[in-house]
Amino acid sequence: MSTYRDFTLAHRGSARGTVLRTIGTRERRSHLTAPRVPTVGIDIGGTKVMAGVVDADGIILEKIRAETPDKSKSAKVVEDTIVELVLDLSDRHDVHAVGIGAAGWVDADRSRVLFAPHLAWRDEPLRDALQSRLAVPVMVDNDANTAAWAEWRFGAGRGEDHLVMITLGTGIGGAILEGGQVKRGRYGVAGEFGHMQVVPGGHRCPCGNRGCWEQYSSGNALVREARELAAADSPVAHNIIARVGGNVAEITGPLITELAREGDAMCVELLQDIGQWLGVGIANLAAALDPSCFVIGGGVSAADDLLIGPARDAFRRHLTGRGYRPEARIAKAQLGPEAGMVGAADLSRLVARRFRRATRRRVERYERYAQLGRRDAAAGPEDQDQQ
């Protein structure tokens, strides 16, 4: 695996380009030297960990995946999985930085995962733990932030000055970009839209509350409703029951989407219900944030217009002041399930640049000290006394 000494020596004088300068939690456009080396992005979701090598243009050079360790396992088990994936990729690629998109609340310094509803992380110092084991710079961010960054840089959000990303997977993630900056909030946890309570006293959420938005418009919500109908042996569920051989536990989101495309009435209606709740939430976010564009991503978005069509309809019905205000565009994400991984890799490239500049400053400082030491040694003790 490459170290940062290798990186510094190999990439002095790399091509200049427009990059984003990281200051605290803000990214600003800056025409500075940026390393255009491949970096590794890792997207950690509730069911899978996806890792890939991504170049500076957002092109995936290679990707691999593993199952997400069970929530009951220790936080270190997830860390071990990440390290194994990075080491596997480093056998075939130079790894100069690693970006992590984590399904949880990440602090403002992007170093600790404060809480992850679907994982065992509780105030987990993930960045430092991984950095010490991988010997390269590591960046940690919320997975929706990394997905939004990727869509703004390379996908459906290009050219938008105010974008809101909504990711529908195991739960619901969210992110806000304005003027080329990810808005993380004072404590780093802005965009946790999935835990807005939309049904007081409703379904229990892994976060500990009831009635969260993600309990009504997510992959988990979709599968829960289908399994409940199948377990009750509802006549509308006979088709999906037959497809899984009567094993209700085998019902998955992709299967529901597949059957909906084939015209299965129950699956079509389930996706419509999920879409309706999605549209209601988007209308609420439009009232609060007034973006120019909503980008819908995550695994559930693979249902395309079976989901997004009902969402657009519900959005228009519930939008405050409709007819008297501009309406935000609702677009499906273009980068698919790899968006979080691509965005994490791209954001880690900014961290790599900062490390590179810091390394250069340290080298220059040491060289100055060495020159002073050589000069003092050449002067001799008598000359130094005279000075």
Feature map (PLM): residue ranges:
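Short hydrophobic alpha-helix segments
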Residues: 64-66, 117, 186
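ATP-binding/phosphotransfer module of carbohydrate and carboxylate kinases, centering on a glycine-rich
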Residues: 2-13, 17-97, 107-112, 127-138, ...
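Short, intrinsically disordered C-terminal tails of secreted or membrane-associated proteins
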Residues: 381-386
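Active-site nucleophile and cofactor-binding loops and adjacent substrate-binding regions
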Residues: 117-123, 139-145, 165-168, 331-338
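A short acidic/small-residue loop/turn micro-motif
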Residues: 68-70, 121, 189-192
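Short, charged low-complexity linear segments at domain edges
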Residues: 176-192
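Adenylate-forming
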Residues: 147-153, 174-176, 195-196
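Short beta-strand segments
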Residues: 43, 99-103, 141, 165-171, ...
